[in-house]
């Protein structure tokens, strides 16, 4: 699912419940949530959405890598990378859904 598909699906759900809210409102809501999450991670904060999962930062220490084309050694600096860990409810829901699909 892409961001555009998420916005479209949210817009459809909002339209079912309240005709006052349109696609632009759903787009603003999704963009606001994603911006808030990105800003929190950029500040080093952890994000936890109960039943869904958590977003955190993993530290990657500096290392010596190789250029795959030339084989030359390359110094790779330290960095922090975003990491998502699925919550128990999400893992169980995905597993159950996929098991049902394979058995059908």
Swiss-Prot record:
GO annotation, biological process: DNA recombination; regulation of DNA-templated transcription; regulation of translation
InterPro entries (UniProt xref): Hist_DNA-bd (IPR000119), IHF-like_DNA-bd_dom_sf (IPR010992), IHF_beta (IPR005685)
Keywords for the protein's UniProt record, in alphabetical order: DNA recombination, DNA-binding, Transcription, Transcription regulation, Translation regulation
Cellular component aspect of the GO annotation: chromosome; cytosol
Subunit annotation: Heterodimer of an alpha and a beta chain.
Family (UniProt): Belongs to the bacterial histone-like protein family.
Protein name: Integration host factor subunit beta
Originating organism: Chromobacterium violaceum (strain ATCC 12472 / DSM 30191 / JCM 1249 / CCUG 213 / NBRC 12614 / NCIMB 9131 / NCTC 9757 / MK)
């Amino acid at each position: 699912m892409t961001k555009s598909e998420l916005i479209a699906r949210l817009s459809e759900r909002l339209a079912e419940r309240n005709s006052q809210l349109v696609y632009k409102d759903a787009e603003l809501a999704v963009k606001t949530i994603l911006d808030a999450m990105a800003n929190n991670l950029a500040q080093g904060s952890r994000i936890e959405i109960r039943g869904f999962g958590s977003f955190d930062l993993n530290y990657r220490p500096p290392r010596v890598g190789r250029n795959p084309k030339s084989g030359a050694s390359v110094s790779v600096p330290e960095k922090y990378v975003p990491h998502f860990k699925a919550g128990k409810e999400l893992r169980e829901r995905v597993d159950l859904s996929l098991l049902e699909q394979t058995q059908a």
